[in-house]
């Protein structure tokens, strides 16, 4: 417990919070060749490799992930949600924040139905999360 005198002299330091998705909070100015701090909801990037990963201990699967080089120069691992995808090397994708709990190092999701990423086929429920259009009657 600090004394009143200590608080008057120094005051309390506010806690610093670490970002869950740091790649979204960094912008690159190619003219000045410098980085600026500005948050953005999504970022565009190019797939450098598309592969599968195995999840942590109690789970078992082959989860589809892509290594993406973003417009700010950072390279991140991002998850490809849904069943089936059309992504390959050099595909242009849009990523959003959001980690995958059982894949270490995967902090981002690829947005389905945006840019080169196709929507999930034959999806009836939760369509907005997978870029699927409303089916014709």
Curated annotation (Swiss-Prot):
Q: What cellular-component terms does GO give this entry?
A: small ribosomal subunit
Disordered: region residues: 1-25
Query: What positions are modified (3-methylthioaspartic acid)?
Result: 102
* Record keyword Transferase present: no
Mind listing the GO biological process terms from this record?
Answer: translation
Q: Name one GO molecular function term.
A: rRNA binding
Q: Which UniProt keywords apply?
A: Methylation, Ribonucleoprotein, Ribosomal protein, RNA-binding, rRNA-binding, tRNA-binding
Q: Name one Pfam family in it.
A: Ribosom_S12_S23
Spell out the coiled coil positions from the record. none
Extract the InterPro entries matched here.
NA-bd_OB-fold, Ribosomal_uS12, Ribosomal_uS12_bac
Asked if the keyword RNA-binding belongs to this entry, the reply reads yes
Q: Give the source's domain of life in one word.
A: Bacteria
Q: To which protein family does this belong? A: Belongs to the universal ribosomal protein uS12 family.
HAMAP family in the cross-refs: Ribosomal_uS12_B
- Indicate the quaternary assembly: Part of the 30S ribosomal subunit. Contacts proteins S8 and S17. May interact with IF1 in the 30S initiation complex.
What is the stated purpose of this protein?
A: With S4 and S5 plays an important role in translational accuracy. Interacts with and stabilizes bases of the 16S rRNA that are involved in tRNA selection in the A site and with the mRNA backbone. Located at the interface of the 30S and 50S subunits, it traverses the body of the 30S subunit contacting proteins on the other side and probably holding the rRNA structure together. The combined cluster of proteins S8, S12 and S17 appears to hold together the shoulder and platform of the 30S subunit.
According to UniProt, the name of this protein is: Small ribosomal subunit protein uS12
Upper lineage: Bacteria, Bacillati, Bacillota, Tissierellia, Tissierellales
